Structures are given as C-alpha cells and as structure tokens.
Curated annotation (Swiss-Prot):
GO CC terms in record: chloroplast thylakoid membrane
The family this protein is said to belong to: Belongs to the SecY/SEC61-alpha family.
Pfam families (alphabetical): SecY (PF00344)
Protein name per UniProt: Protein translocase subunit SecY
Keywords of the record: Chloroplast, Membrane, Plastid, Protein transport, Thylakoid, Translocation, Transmembrane, Transmembrane helix, Transport
Length: 419
C-alpha cells in the first residue's frame, strides 16, 4: 500500500497542479479590458460571428471580450516564425542544435519577443472591431486594448509553460482544450437547431452529430497511435549473426507525429489572412466577393486549409524528427538500419520514411476536416461550422495525447521505482 502511495503521489500532485492552473486560467476570462463596458452588447451581437472569435477559439482564448481574448494565437505565430528561421538560417540552427541549453534559451527569448509583436498586431485588429461598440473611443483606447490583451496572452504563455514543466501534458494544448470545452454549445451553428422544427430532421441531425463524433474519434486515434517502424540492428547482432524478430529493435514513426500543430498553425494563418483582407479598405472586389460568399468561402477555406495542413504536417515532422540527428544517434549506439548502409544512405532512407508517415498522417487529418461536410451532404442537414469542426478535432487529438503522456509518466515512475 505504501509503495502504491509513493508511486501515485507525484502523478496526483502533477494532476492537481495542472487542474488548479487551468481553473486559474479560466477565471481570467472574466477580467474585462479596462474601459470596455459594452461587453455584453458586443458579444451577443457580433463577436461570435467574427474571424477574431474563431481565431481565439482555436488558440485557448476567451469566448467573451476579456484580457485573454487573443489566447495563445500570437505565441503560435511567433513559434512558427522562429522555426522557419531555424530552418532557413544556419546561425539559428546552430543555436538550437549545437549551443545546448544557452542556445535554446536564446531561441525562447526570440520567440517571446515575436510573441509581443504579434500580440500588438492582433490587438489592433481587435480594437478596430471594438470601435463601433464602445462610447468615447479615442486613440488612447488602442493602447489600452493592446496593453491589456498583450499582458493576458503573455500570462497564458507563462501558465502553459508551467503546466508543461511541472504538470501533466502539453500546457498550450490543455489550455486550448479547456477553451473548446467551455464554448462547446457554440461550436454548432445556431441556425441548425432553430430550423429543426420537424421531428425527422431533428433525428437526422442527432444521427449526424453522433456519426461525426465517432468518426472523429476513430480517425483521431489512428492519427495519434498509428505508426510505421524502422527496423534497427545493433553491431553485436550483426557480429553474432542474430537477427530474429524477438531481438530486433525498431524506431517508431507515428503518422500524427506533428500532433495538432498543423491544424493550429493552418487555422491561425488562414483566419488571420481572411481577417486582414476583410479589413483592407481597398481590397480587390473579386477577393472580397469570394470571402463574403458563404459557399465560395467554404470551398476556398477547405481547399486552402487542406493544403496548409499537408504542408505543416511535413514541415513540423521534419523539425522534430531530424534525419541527420537520428542517423547520428544510431551511429553513437553502434546500430544500423537493416539492409541500409550507414551515412548518406541512412539519412535518405530515414527522410523518405518520415515523409511517407507524414503523408499518411496528413491524409488522416484531411479526412477529419472533410468527414463532417460529406456526412451533412449525405444526410441533408446543416454541417457543423468550420471553427466547430476544427475545435472538435483539436479536442480529440489533445485528449488522446494527454492520456498517452499520463500513461507514459506512470510507466516511467514504475520503472524507476522497480529498478
């Protein structure tokens, strides 16, 4: 009994710490922006219909106008920009891979500086949306809104880091999950239920929701748990001539190795672009017609969304799984990939293997995006809103990832205590 208590104690403490931080983060949603008093009117009349709300929904932000409205969106944008710099400039790559802890701290510092910059940019878009709903608006109001939401976003970034380091799971992902759960009743188009006066239509819509949720659960699990394995043989096995399956090692490459990052990045970029274009006074007429048309907007959104998801699936997987690093580690362990020569051939093989796994993962993520719309067309009901589909995908993926991390932490504790 005592051993079991010692085993579970640290895990329980981490879970408790995580829950308390998430509660604290949710309380921040009720802290208004100084000087913004017409919150309820603005919220009910238009906020839920804006791209800013959708962007906030996908980044752990508030579902009302508060200091946490921007959520973690600016941080995601800054992280993406820094990762591009790491890949494009050798100096940044050296900082991340060769400078050790000091180099990583420098990368984190650059990310935080860019986060502040993106906060300021997005806060001015938010300010433009607020102008017509706030009395006595003046130039100082821009700076008040910018300071308030920038501070709120940076606090969320700090809380996410605390969860990641001292809690359970990925902090930013859990903040997004809690935000999605809190606005679950808003994920479905309001008109969907208002128009369901006929019993048969109501039953069809319930069937649609159930099938959609089950399909998302299945495809999300396949994406997170499915993997391809690279067979690895040690030098000792080669010398002894023993290569049986029982003693063979593998390097697992998950289909969804990039996790929910491709969806978060794709959603953030697309919503930021559409918001920016809509607010341009001299935007091209054809462009504005496309964005203002619901059907065309869905076609444009889905096509661009799928392309971005596929791109970021490949891009981010190659960032977190570098073929060169894997080849170096194999060399250090005196191991080789079966039937592959060490050196350049190994790097090429690993890169090809990772790209194949990423392709399958991107197809699974794309299927998750398309399934709700296909089912809605087949059953003749209104589809889930675009932001609703994305939020559900994120929620399922984050839950799967968090459960896996909890189990991994528990197994690690058991191993350490038994050794």
């Amino acid at each position: 009994m005592k051993k079991a208590f010692v085993l579970e104690g640290p895990l329980v403490l981490r879970l408790f710490r995580t829950i308390m931080i998430l509660i604290f983060a949710r309380l921040g949603n009720y802290i208004p922006i100084p000087g913004i008093t017409e919150v309820e009117s603005f919220y009910e009349s238009s906020f839920r219909n804006t791209s800013i709300y959708n962007l906030s929904a996908l980044s752990g932000g508030s579902n009302v106008i508060s200091i946490l409205t921007l959520g973690l969106g600016p941080f995601f944008s800054a992280s993406l920009a820094v990762q591009f710099l790491v890949k494009l400039y050798p100096a940044f790559e050296k900082l991340q891979n060769e400078e050790g802890e000091e180099g990583r701290k420098t990368i984190v510092r650059y990310t935080r500086i860019l986060t502040v910059l993106f906060c300021i940019i997005e806060s001015f878009f938010l300010s433009n949306s607020l102008r017509s709903f706030v009395f006595n608006w003046n130039s100082i109001s821009y700076f008040v809104v910018a300071a308030a939401v920038t501070t709120g976003s940076l606090v969320l970034v700090w809380l996410s880091e605390v969860i990641t380091e001292r809690g359970i799971g990925n902090g930013s992902s859990l903040l997004i999950l809690i935000g999605n759960l809190s606005r679950f009743r808003f994920l479905i188009n309001k008109d969907d239920f208002d128009s369901l006066n006929v019993s048969s239509q109501s039953n069809l819509y319930i069937i649609y929701i159930i099938i959609t949720l089950v399909s998302m659960l299945i495809f999300s699990t396949l994406s997170q748990e499915g993997a391809r394995k690279i067979p690895v043989v040690s030098a000792k096995q080669l010398i002894d001539g023993v290569e049986d399956d029982m003693r063979r090692s593998y390097i697992p490459i998950r289909f969804g190795q990039a996790g929910v990052v491709p969806i978060i990045f794709s959603s953030s970029i697309l919503l930021f672009l559409t918001t920016s274009i809509k607010q341009l006074p001299n935007a091209n007429i054809a462009t504005r017609v496309i964005l203002d048309s619901v059907n065309l907007q869905q076609i444009f959104y889905f096509f661009t969304f799928l392309v971005l998801i596929i791109f970021f699936s490949f891009f981010y997987t190659l960032i977190i799984l570098s073929p060169s690093d894997i080849a170096k580690n194999l060399k250090k362990m005196s191991s080789v990939i079966q039937d592959t020569k060490p050196g350049v051939a190994t790097k090429v093989y690993i890169r090809k293997f990772i790209l194949q796994a990423s392709f399958v993962g991107s197809i699974l993520l794309s299927a998750l995006i398309l399934i709700p719309s296909i089912l809605a067309a087949a059953l003749g009901v209104h589809p889930l809103s675009i932001s609703g589909i994305t939020s559900l995908i994120l929620s399922f993926s984050i839950i799967n990832d968090t459960v896996r991390q909890v189990l991994a932490y528990r197994d690690t504790r058991k191993f350490l205590l038994s050794s």
